[in-house]
Amino acid sequence: DAEHKSNICKHFQVVGEEKFKNIILVTQDGHGPFIQVSKEEQCKHYAENRVPYMGNFIYTAAKRHPDLPATEVLIYAFXYESGAVLVSYPEMVGCCPPDVL
């Protein structure tokens, strides 16, 4: 029975990997779902979606740490935005207007 279970697990592991490759990595047209865009496009997307992105961060931080005062959550959000964006997207430095970053 242990060998049978092992074979079943291996089968599902292979089938699962194939489904992942077919569903996530490749769409029907043969291209992946994630498109590489230019630095200007990335900057534009970030600038257009900055408020919802940071709103989601503030909401999540406040929900996970209900004991923190609102001012601390906002301070962490500001530090996260200025630190995480510049570290995660160093190519945005210099392409975005100064009021965005």
UniProtKB/Swiss-Prot annotation:
Residues engaged in binding Cu cation: 4
UniProt superkingdom: Eukaryota
InterPro entries in the record: Serum_albumin-like
Keywords: Copper, Lipid-binding, Metal-binding, Repeat, Secreted
GO terms under cellular component: extracellular space
Main location, first listed in the record: secreted
Protein name from the UniProt record: Albumin
Source species of the chain: Neoceratodus forsteri (Australian lungfish)
Source organism phylogeny: Eukaryota, Metazoa, Chordata, Craniata, Vertebrata
Gene that this polypeptide is encoded by: alb
